[in-house]
Curated annotation (Swiss-Prot):
<comment type="pathway">
    <text>Pyrimidine metabolism; UMP biosynthesis via de novo pathway; orotate from (S)-dihydroorotate (quinone route): step 1/1.</text>
</comment>
<feature type="binding site">
    <location>
        <position position="69"/>
    </location>
    <ligand>
        <name>substrate</name>
    </ligand>
</feature>
<feature type="binding site">
    <location>
        <position position="142"/>
    </location>
    <ligand>
        <name>FMN</name>
    </ligand>
</feature>
<feature type="binding site">
    <location>
        <position position="220"/>
    </location>
    <ligand>
        <name>FMN</name>
    </ligand>
</feature>
<dbReference type="Pfam" id="PF01180">
    <property type="entry name" value="DHO_dh"/>
</dbReference>
<feature type="binding site">
    <location>
        <begin position="321"/>
        <end position="322"/>
    </location>
    <ligand>
        <name>FMN</name>
    </ligand>
</feature>
<dbReference type="GO" id="GO:0106430">
    <property type="term" value="F:dihydroorotate dehydrogenase (quinone) activity"/>
</dbReference>
<feature type="active site" description="Nucleophile">
    <location>
        <position position="178"/>
    </location>
</feature>
<dbReference type="InterPro" id="IPR001295">
    <property type="entry name" value="Dihydroorotate_DH_CS"/>
</dbReference>
<feature type="binding site">
    <location>
        <begin position="249"/>
        <end position="250"/>
    </location>
    <ligand>
        <name>substrate</name>
    </ligand>
</feature>
<dbReference type="InterPro" id="IPR050074">
    <property type="entry name" value="DHO_dehydrogenase"/>
</dbReference>
<feature type="binding site">
    <location>
        <position position="300"/>
    </location>
    <ligand>
        <name>FMN</name>
    </ligand>
</feature>
<dbReference type="InterPro" id="IPR005719">
    <property type="entry name" value="Dihydroorotate_DH_2"/>
</dbReference>
<feature type="binding site">
    <location>
        <position position="271"/>
    </location>
    <ligand>
        <name>FMN</name>
    </ligand>
</feature>
<dbReference type="InterPro" id="IPR013785">
    <property type="entry name" value="Aldolase_TIM"/>
</dbReference>
<dbReference type="InterPro" id="IPR005720">
    <property type="entry name" value="Dihydroorotate_DH_cat"/>
</dbReference>
<comment type="subunit">
    <text>Monomer.</text>
</comment>
Length: 344
């Protein structure tokens, strides 16, 4: 029912400022999660279980981090049929992010540009929100660093967040690829990444001993990488036995949107224009890591065929964000059905 109504809802939301519409959507999702309305209105999504990173996913179509930064809408989102939910990015301390306006739609390209800057209420509130959710499915918690933490001390922020979220996560995503936190992508460099992953894996083992469970770690990377950088990242993931990698975050490229309104705004571009670049990174990663590091594919999925293309490139699971904004819950069902049929 809601799927047929969503174009009308979207038309109203798209008349609003992009960030105001985002906040309204979150409020509606929070209310729908409390009342059970989201599940009643959402299209039926078939179960198509997958085992990845040692975890069972109800279906291979997840929500990417960034929509629900504070983990306040988990129940409402889960009712829409996602096989897994990822929330965040969260930082040790609350921070406002970058000045507004900082989110821009490019509807002619089915795209969004954002420079949010990890705005969030901090990890303590994040954990409270996660604990309050009734959802018991697969839940990814995405961690980052505060904007005012020197890049040389970035590992401290990631280690602190990992310790705080560890007991409540199905898996933890380490986000080093947002273009909206100064110098963050430097952590994708060979030396910096090697040191960070070594520290995280050491912390993971100590937390596993403490809590009696091993929570997988996934690394989220950018699409703006050359072949040598992809190989270096793949080698580092293998060396430290990271459990997963998410490919990819938003792009700094504007080639596909030149001349469109807002195309020159600073920030990361997501949506249809990042689809091919994301797939190319997935293919290169798969060639380097084989089956040893599962890949979660994200970037520009607007149809079931797009989701299948991610798996064909080498991903084991997919995530939606911008396509979900443009198409609504119907996209979740379409992608899940397409992947279930392919697996049958």
């Amino acid at each position: 029912m809601f799927s047929s109504l969503y174009p009308l809802v979207r038309a109203q939301l798209f008349r609003m400022d992009a960030e105001d519409a985002h906040h309204l959507t979150l409020r509606l999702l929070r209310a729908a999660g409390r009342t059970g309305l989201a599940g009643a209105l959402a299209p039926r999504v078939p179960d198509s279980p997958r085992t990845v990173m040692g975890l069972t996913f109800r279906n291979p179509v997840g929500l990417a981090a960034g929509l629900d930064k504070d983990g306040a809408c988990i129940d409402g989102l889960a009712a829409l049929g996602f096989g897994f939910i990822e929330v965040g990015t969260v930082t040790p301390r609350a921070q406002p992010g970058n000045p507004r306006p900082r989110m821009f739609r490019l509807p002619q390209a089915d795209a969004v540009i954002n420079r949010m800057g990890f705005n969030n209420a901090g990890v303590d509130q994040f954990v409270k929100n996660v604990q309050a959710a009734r959802y018991r499915g697969t839940l990814g918690l995405n961690i980052g660093k505060n904007a005012d933490t020197p890049i040389e001390r970035a590992a401290d922020d990631y280690l602190y967040c990992l310790e705080r979220v560890y007991p409540f996560a199905s898996y933890v995503t380490v986000n080093i690829s947002s273009p909206n936190t100064k110098n963050l992508r430097q952590l994708q460099g060979a030396g910096e990444l090697d040191a960070l992953l070594a520290a995280l894996k050491d912390k993971q083992q100590r937390l596993a001993d403490l809590h009696g469970k091993l929570v997988p770690l996934a690394l989220k990377i950018a699409p703006d990488l050359d072949d040598e950088q992809v190989k270096s990242i793949a080698d580092t993931l293998l060396r430290h036995q990271f459990e997963g990698v998410i490919a990819t975050n938003t792009t700094l490229s504007r080639t596909a949107v030149q001349g469109l309104p807002h195309a020159d705004e600073a920030g990361g571009l997501s949506g249809r224009p990042v689809f091919d670049a994301s797939n190319e990174v997935i293919r290169k990663l798969r060639a380097e890591v084989g089956g040893d590091v599962p890949i979660i594919g994200v970037g520009g999925i607007f149809s079931g065929a797009d989701a299948q293309a991610k798996l064909d490139a080498g991903a084991s699971l997919v995530q939606l964000y911008t396509g979900f904004i443009y198409r609504g819950p119907a996209l979740v069902a379409e992608c899940a059905q397409a992947l279930a049929m392919r697996a049958a």
